[in-house]
């Protein structure tokens, strides 16, 4: 356990599904001495893929936190999933990382999920280096991939290595800083060290050209280096590395390395790059939070054991022996087993049981959790994802994480009475672990409805209910998570709630206005939502201050069940303009009911419409099936955004309603003899065409 934070790296490995993330992580663990036998994703032996479903499906679902060492540096790695349905795992891990390795498929370049994960990393200001993997694959093209990093991500790639050979003949890399060739000739066993050679003659000119580009970029990073470089002076290797590191930490450039993790070529230089260029907790610097007593006040904590404790819980996982594991990034201060900490998000004190550093699903006990590191805590009862843990005498709330709403739902019915009880426990445990997994009772049908980020997400959750909690249940067909909103403002709607039933009565009068509300993300204040805004415009104490939050709460209750078909309302601003109260008969409950009813009446007059989730779909297909594929997209109410050439095939980009995409994988296979593939990510909500909306509403209201 290192105390020198300069030698600690908290990094994530992020990529599109199947770009080779988990294999890259496995190789890193082997080379850093943790794994004696290397695990392969395709035979279900990977260390970080430790849930049953991950082993079966060969994809990574849960970010496992793994600690390893390289050249006296400690590297904490979070292996993040690349499948779109698990974006919440990616968001959670990025929030607590200092840097990341973005892995790209050397043939495909930047893929849709790579773009989404890249955007998420940019949102959290995570510095990155890039690894172009699968250089041994048929059709692998390093220069094409670097081009896609620039064109599709709008990033500035800094080429650090050139490949020697490609596809089967990929033998190694040219190191552009040292100007040497590192080769792993032929079939290399795992653990094989690179042979250092002179650069092959046919690559010397190209290497010289790319080194000049690299040095020009380095020179531009400071006036002093620029004067020296363009004055003809040689820059030293330590100077070049220090300048690149500074640019990476500031997210100005993204160094690009290459190799094939599966064939054990290029992994050691990648590890060197993690240490050389990605930031330590000291580079990342102070973490900001807000004062519990006064949310207007910003507090900071330095990454030091001597500061008061501040830490963020970023993941909950169930452990077969210890029960609930809470994965925590400690930003400042230190914690020991048995110590009491404050969960400032919930306002509750928690006692820390045991502390571990995790190696996938194996645990190593530690005596002290130090600043700047990642640990698993045992014994925290009330802490959930996104909560802050801190020193009870110096409370702080760190910026929380925001998670997307589910876009797909299914009804779930337990088969027997005992399954009913087990289902309750299973749902509670899974919802604790995963904030994008939701559950509610459909009041009309009496069914339990669970929601998630896609069909695979819900499949995995239902699978876990069966395996881990032994719940047998019938699962309904997927349903789309529609929303409702309003299209026109309604002004000064008055509603009076009055009840006289012996003794004290109930009285509350409110006058509200509502209007469509869709602010741009950058216009929102900290903690504000784009879904709903409440404004209090009451003057002169016509409604006492203590009743105002009740009106707000009543409106928020009413927003859960929309006017058209009972779907949640979004993008509405409500203003409380005026009202009246009674000294004896008014109460918080009366104002809550008045707010709720006034809002419902206003929505009915505000031209309510139905919204549906639209997915951004990318289909890669051989050219001969283009007509079929495009015709099929059009028949699904899809809109083609663009068509382009992609590595001997055609790439079709489209926006398609989610309701039209169920079962698409089978349809696409049969239309293209299994030669096309697709990926989709959630794009936005859009208004449902009138004729389609009428059917959805009729079906929902039981009048179809």
UniProtKB/Swiss-Prot annotation:
Main location group: cytoplasm
InterPro entries: EFG_II (IPR041095), EFG_III (IPR009022), EFG_III/V (IPR035647), EFG_IV (IPR047872), EFG_V (IPR035649), EFG_V-like (IPR000640), EFTu-like_2 (IPR004161), G_TR_CS (IPR031157)
GO BP terms, alphabetized: ribosome disassembly
Subcellular location: Cytoplasm
Database matches in CDD domains: EF-G, EFG_III, EFG_mtEFG1_IV, EFG_mtEFG_C, EFG_mtEFG_II
GO molecular function, one term: GTP binding
SMART domains in the cross-refs: EFG_C (SM00838), EFG_IV (SM00889)
GO cellular component: cytoplasm
Domain of life: Bacteria
Domain tr-type G, residue spans: 6-282
Annotated TM spans: none
Keywords: Cytoplasm, Elongation factor, GTP-binding, Nucleotide-binding, Protein biosynthesis
Keyword Transferase: no
Residues engaged in binding GTP: 15-22, 79-83, 133-136
Entry keyword annotation includes Transmembrane helix: no
HAMAP family: EF_G_EF_2_B
Similarity-based family: Belongs to the TRAFAC class translation factor GTPase superfamily. Classic translation factor GTPase family. EF-G/EF-2 subfamily.
Function summary: Catalyzes the GTP-dependent ribosomal translocation step during translation elongation. During this step, the ribosome changes from the pre-translocational (PRE) to the post-translocational (POST) state as the newly formed A-site-bound peptidyl-tRNA and P-site-bound deacylated tRNA move to the P and E sites, respectively. Catalyzes the coordinated movement of the two tRNA molecules, the mRNA and conformational changes in the ribosome.
Protein's name in the database: Elongation factor G
Source organism of the structure: Corynebacterium efficiens (strain DSM 44549 / YS-314 / AJ 12310 / JCM 11189 / NBRC 100395)
Gene from which the chain derives: fusA
């Amino acid at each position: 356990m290192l105390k020198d934070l300069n030698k600690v790296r908290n990094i994530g490995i992020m990529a599109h599904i199947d770009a080779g993330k988990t294999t890259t992580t496995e190789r890193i663990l082997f080379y850093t001495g943790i794994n004696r036998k290397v695990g392969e994703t395709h035979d279900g032996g990977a260390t970080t893929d430790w849930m049953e479903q991950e082993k079966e499906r060969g994809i990574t679902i849960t970010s496992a936190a793994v600690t390893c060492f390289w050249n006296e540096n400690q590297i904490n790695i979070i292996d993040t999933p690349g499948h779109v349905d698990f974006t919440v795992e990616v968001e959670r891990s990025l929030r607590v990382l200092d840097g990341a390795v973005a892995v790209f498929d050397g043939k495909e370049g930047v893929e849709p999920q790579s773009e989404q994960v890249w955007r998420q990393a940019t949102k959290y200001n995570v510095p990155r280096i890039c690894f172009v993997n699968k250089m041994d694959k048929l059709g692998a093209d390093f220069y094409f991939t670097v081009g896609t990093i620039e064109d599709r991500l709008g990033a500035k790639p800094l080429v650090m290595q050139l490949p020697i050979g490609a596809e089967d003949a990929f033998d190694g890399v040219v190191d552009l800083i040292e100007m040497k060739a590192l080769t792993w000739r032929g079939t290399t066993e795992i653990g094989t060290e690179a042979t250092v050679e002179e650069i092959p003659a046919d690559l010397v000119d190209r290497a010289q050209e790319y080194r000049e580009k690299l040095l020009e970029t380095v020179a531009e990073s400071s006036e002093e280096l620029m004067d020296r470089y363009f004055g003809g002076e040689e820059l030293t290797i330590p100077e070049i590395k220090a300048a690149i590191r500074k640019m990476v930490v500031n997210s100005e450039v993204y160094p690009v390395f290459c190799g094939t993790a599966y064939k054990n070529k290029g992994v050691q230089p990648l590890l060197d790059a993690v240490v050389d260029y990605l930031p330590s907790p000291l580079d990342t610097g102070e973490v900001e939070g807000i004062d519990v007593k006064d949310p207007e006040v910003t507090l900071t904590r330095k990454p030091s054991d001597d500061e008061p404790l501040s830490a963020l819980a970023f993941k909950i996982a169930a452990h077969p022996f210890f029960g609930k594991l809470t994965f925590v990034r400690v930003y400042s201060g230190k914690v020991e087993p048995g110590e009491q900490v404050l969960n400032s998000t919930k306002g509750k004190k928690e006692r820390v049981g045991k502390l571990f550093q995790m190696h996938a699903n194996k645990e190593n006990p530690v005596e002290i959790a130090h600043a700047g590191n990642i640990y698993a805590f045992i014994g925290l009862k009330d802490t959930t994802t996104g909560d802050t843990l801190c020193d009870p005498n110096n409370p702080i709330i760190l910026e929380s994480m925001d998670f997307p709403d589910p876009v797909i739902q299914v009804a779930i019915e337990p088969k027997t009475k005992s399954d009913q009880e087990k289902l309750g426990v299973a749902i509670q445990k899974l919802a604790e672990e995963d904030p994008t997994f939701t559950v509610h009772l459909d009041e009309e049908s009496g069914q339990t409805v669970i929601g998630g980020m896609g069909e695979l997400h819900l499949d995995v959750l239902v699978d876990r209910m069966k395996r881990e909690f032994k719940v047998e249940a019938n699962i309904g067909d997927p349903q789309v998570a529609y929303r409702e909103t309003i299209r026109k403002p309604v002004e000064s709607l008055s509603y009076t709630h009055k009840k006289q039933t012996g003794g004290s009565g109930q009285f509350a009068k409110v006058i509200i206005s509502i209007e469509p509300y869709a602010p741009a993300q950058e216009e929102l204040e900290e903690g504000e939502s784009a879904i709903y805004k409440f404004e209090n415009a009451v003057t002169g104490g016509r409604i006492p201050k203590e009743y105002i939050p009740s009106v707000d709460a009543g409106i928020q209750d009413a927003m859960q069940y929309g006017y058209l078909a009972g779907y949640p309302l979004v993008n509405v601003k409500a203003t409380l303009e005026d009202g009246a109260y009674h000294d004896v008969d008014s109460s918080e409950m009366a104002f809550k009911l008045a707010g709720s009813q006034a809002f419902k009446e206003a929505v009915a007059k505000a031209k309510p419409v139905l919204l549906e989730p639209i997915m951004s779909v990318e289909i890669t297909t051989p050219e001969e099936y283009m007509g079929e594929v495009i015709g099929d997209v059009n028949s699904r109410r899809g809109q083609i955004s663009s068509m382009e050439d992609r590595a001997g095939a055609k790439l079709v980009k489209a926006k398609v309603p989610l309701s039209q995409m169920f079962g698409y994988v089978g349809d696409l296979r049969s239309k293209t003899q299994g030669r096309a593939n697709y990926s989709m990510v959630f794009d936005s909500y859009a208004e449902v065409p009138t004729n389609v909306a009428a059917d959805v509403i009729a079906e929902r209201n039981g009048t179809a």
